[in-house]
């Protein structure tokens, strides 16, 4: 996935800078799910729910000054889901995959030796990929059509350091998605548990 590859490159760049001059750099891999209102029908159109599914999250953040910094994350759904009972132009049930991504200002603190916490706010997007049984080729070949929506994002987490600088981190995220007409609600929540490592001076 292009967004995932771009995010990995960004994380590597942040890690390089962090080891040189930052207070702290965190990198993590997480698994979680999305919660949103149930599907609805207004008599004319049916609106599926975004709830459910396993999401993989790749995240990184870097703190520079007075516990302030920036970070980013990308969260694709692990498997394709069925878009309600909609049948596409090829006569088969429509499959789709959501991808959430965001870039944030971050405030993070460590408490004693075992705990830390972060709060964040920023912008990002929701990339909805609707899959087709054939590939379309331009500069690259893909078998999906994307519907992209701008999103605001807020989130918070709690880090527990279980071994040195390695941590487990429960997280909660809230997205305000603009013009998310494909689904029943524009504001899904994402809940994740991540495992990661904090790179600090002297690690």
Positions of PLM-derived features:
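Polyanion-binding surface elements
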Residues: 157
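Cleavable N-terminal export/targeting peptides
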Residues: 1-24, 202-203
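Extracellular loop and loop/strand-boundary signature of outer-membrane beta-barrel proteins
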Residues: 41-47, 86-94, 137-144, 179-184
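Gram-negative (and chloroplast) outer-membrane scaffold detector with strong preference
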Residues: 31-37, 56-139, 149, 160-162, ...
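Short glycine/proline-enriched turn or capping motifs at secondary-structure junctions
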Residues: 4-6, 183-195
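Short catalytic helix/loop segments, enriched in acidic residues and glycine
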Residues: 48-57
């Amino acid at each position: 996935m292009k967004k995932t590859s771009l995010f990995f490159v960004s994380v590597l760049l942040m890690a390089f800078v962090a080891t040189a001059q930052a207070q702290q750099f965190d990198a993590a891999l997480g698994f979680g799910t999305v919660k949103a209102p149930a599907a609805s029908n207004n008599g004319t159109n049916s609106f599926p729910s975004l709830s459910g599914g396993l999401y993989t999250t790749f995240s990184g953040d870097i703190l520079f000054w007075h516990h302030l910094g920036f970070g980013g994350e990308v969260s694709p759904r692990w498997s394709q889901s069925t878009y309600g009972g909609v049948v596409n132009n090829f006569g088969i049930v429509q499959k789709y995959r959501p991808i959430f991504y965001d870039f944030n200002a971050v405030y993070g603190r460590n408490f004693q030796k075992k705990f830390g916490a972060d709060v964040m706010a920023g912008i990002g997007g929701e990339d909805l990929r609707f899959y087709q049984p054939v590939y379309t080729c331009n500069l690259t070949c893909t078998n999906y059509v994307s519907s992209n929506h701008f999103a605001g994002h807020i989130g918070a987490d709690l880090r527990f350091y279980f071994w040195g600088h390695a941590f487990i981190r429960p997280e909660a995220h809230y997205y305000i998605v603009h013009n998310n007409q494909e689904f029943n609600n524009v504001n899904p929540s994402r809940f994740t548990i991540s495992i990661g490592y904090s790179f600090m001076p002297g690690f």
